[in-house]
């Protein structure tokens, strides 16, 4: 499929987009992660961006994509409630990989939000969704607009959750193309990549965390829990960034 016809996808319905991208996704499924990144850079429209939560295995996609596009803007939506270890990890990877880090946050500070709304994350699913809209979704939408993004790399993997288990390599979200180069990787493959390239897991990995987000909605893994249950008190998995 040509870049011109890909560009037409943005104005299609979700069903039309899926049908239009079906053939190319079959081809992308046969490629390895490096080939997917290079295919995207050659065939998808710029500007390109890469998003990262700087979670447990974030170094993989950050390294993979920046090896091919060193100066790609790396979007972080900072809620102000990340773990201290996450901020330290961000600083370390930014220096190590020479990242072009672009930080976007909510219009109002965490303290102001708490004064206005209370602790939204303690107000059930509705409160969590409102919190995510304010602190994740709106800043990401603003980032995509300000950076004039047309193609967006992200490090999601099918193994991470049921909600991600059927995601394609290439899709359209928020009016831009979204490509997931390591979507089919399992934990073993992630570990092999990190080891091969001298990269580290998030510091909290060693303390039993499988997934890391905000300090108040992230739980350490306990026997019998799925990875999904360690986030948002098990009420939901996604923060809204990767949902239409």
From Swiss-Prot:
Top EC class of this enzyme: oxidoreductase
Main location group: cytoplasm
Keywords: Cytoplasm, Oxidoreductase
InterPro entries for this protein: PAPS/APS_Rdtase (IPR004511), PAPS_reduct_dom (IPR002500), PAPS_reductase_CysH (IPR011800), Rossmann-like_a/b/a_fold (IPR014729)
Short name of one Pfam family: PAPS_reduct
GO biological process entries: hydrogen sulfide biosynthetic process; sulfate assimilation, phosphoadenylyl sulfate reduction by phosphoadenylyl-sulfate reductase (thioredoxin)
Keyword Zinc: no
Active site: 239 (nucleophile)
Subcellular location: Cytoplasm
UniProt catalytic activity: [thioredoxin]-disulfide + sulfite + adenosine 3',5'-bisphosphate + 2 H(+) = [thioredoxin]-dithiol + 3'-phosphoadenylyl sulfate
Keyword Repressor appears in the UniProt entry: no
Family affiliation: Belongs to the PAPS reductase family. CysH subfamily.
Name recorded for this polypeptide: Phosphoadenosine 5'-phosphosulfate reductase
